[in-house]
């Protein structure tokens, strides 16, 4: 047998092995999803392989009070996954020469009330949570009147004059406040309302027709209410509307599993950013609490392949968007109940990480 023939046969067996391995994973995924019980997980899960949806299932109730079931097109609160969208908007403006990554905030917001932020904090630091700004969602926000947040500027008084937690550029501190500042800059340099900018430059090009910032006093069809037992006197979940406001650049948009898959696909395939800009976004910049961070995106290097995306959590909200960069899987998990561990949204995410990305490496 000649060398060429041997290589052909070897290639065939390698291809068969790869296909069998992929089919085995897909079968395990189906079996796992079939085993999930609405009593433990409420939400929707989408699995795509090579940018083709292979599983898309909904579980549990969108409204406990009215017995309305979650569906494939149910809109869930995505919490901090909004930050990833804000980062893309920022990098689009960088791409167009309207924003510099190492330029201080004051260049774009000369009247921003905090002088240290104006003079010392850069766009790079805002995108990587190294600006020293705090996380307003765990401060005065909880007790505030959520109805008053109509514009990006409405969020600013909660944190603008707070003391920085660290010298800008020296330490990682997860900061919702920093992403609100990015939202202000997006408005200033684009000349558009933040929400309109997203619709025109991200949602429309990506085909995300079911993603919205949601005015609190408006009615949204197919919306899942979130349910939480935090701050309660019993184990009976209560609706979480008290803890939610209109979306800010740091969190709380509503979306569907399919829309977030479309967002992931558009981002990876050059519809939203040039290849060089996407690579800049995806490159690890700093070490976070457990993963590395690019620009507004988590880069998990703890497994046998890179997992990138973002998670989100709040009272009665859990969201995961994960792209497995070697094996080309995309997983979207949206849940409208508190995370309950093994079969909650984070437990479901762990299942996919172990199955697709292999053995966990040391942190």
Residue ranges of predicted features:
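Bacterial Sec-dependent N-terminal signal peptides
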Residues: 1-28
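Short, gly/Ser/Thr-rich active-site loops of penicillin-recognizing serine hydrolases
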Residues: 24, 306, 337-363
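Short, conserved catalytic-motif segment at the N-terminal edge
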Residues: 25-76, 98-100, 160
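Active-site SXXK
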Residues: 45, 51, 75-102, 179-187, ...
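A short acidic/small-residue loop/turn micro-motif
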Residues: 60-64, 244, 338-340
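Short, glycine/proline-biased beta-turn/loop segments that scaffold the active-site neighborhood
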Residues: 101-116
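Short, surface-exposed loop or secondary-structure junction motifs
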Residues: 116-315
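Short, well-ordered beta-strand elements
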Residues: 310, 318-337
């Amino acid at each position: 047998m000649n060398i060429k023939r041997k290589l052909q046969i070897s290639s065939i067996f390698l291809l068969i092995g790869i296909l069998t391995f992929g089919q085995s994973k897909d079968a395990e995924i189906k079996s796992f999803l079939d085993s999930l019980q609405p009593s433990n997980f409420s939400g929707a899960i989408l699995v795509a392989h090579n940018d083709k949806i292979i599983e898309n299932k909904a579980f549990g109730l969108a409204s406990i009070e009215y017995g309305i079931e979650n569906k494939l097109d149910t809109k869930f609160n995505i919490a901090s996954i909004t930050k990833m969208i804000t980062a893309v908007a920022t990098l689009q403006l960088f791409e167009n020469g309207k924003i510099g990554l190492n330029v201080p905030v004051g260049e774009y917001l000369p009247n921003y009330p905090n002088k240290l932020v104006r003079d010392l904090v850069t766009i790079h630091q805002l995108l990587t949570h190294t600006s020293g700004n705090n996380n307003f969602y765990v401060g005065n926000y909880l007790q505030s009147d959520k109805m008053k947040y109509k514009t990006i500027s409405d969020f600013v008084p909660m944190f603008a004059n707070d003391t920085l937690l660290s010298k800008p550029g020296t330490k990682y501190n997860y900061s919702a406040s920093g992403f609100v500042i990015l939202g202000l800059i997006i408005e200033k340099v684009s000349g558009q309302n933040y929400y309109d900018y997203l619709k025109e430059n991200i949602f429309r090009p990506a085909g995300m027709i079911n993603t919205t910032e949601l005015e609190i006093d408006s009615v949204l069809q197919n919306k899942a209410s979130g349910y939480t037992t935090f701050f309660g006197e019993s184990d009976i979940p209560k609706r979480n509307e008290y803890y939610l406001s209109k979306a800010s650049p740091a969190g709380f948009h509503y979306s569907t599993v399919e829309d977030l898959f479309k967002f992931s696909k558009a981002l990876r395939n050059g519809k939203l950013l040039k290849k060089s800009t996407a690579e800049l976004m995806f490159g690890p910049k700093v070490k976070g609490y457990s993963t590395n961070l690019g620009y507004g995106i988590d880069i998990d290097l703890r497994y046998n392949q890179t997992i990138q995306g973002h998670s989100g959590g709040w009272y009665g909200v859990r969201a995961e968007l994960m792209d497995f960069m070697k094996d080309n899987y995309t997983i979207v998990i949206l849940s409208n109940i508190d995370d309950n561990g093994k079969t909650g949204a984070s437990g479901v995410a762990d299942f996919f990480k172990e199955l697709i990305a292999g053995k966990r490496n040391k942190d």
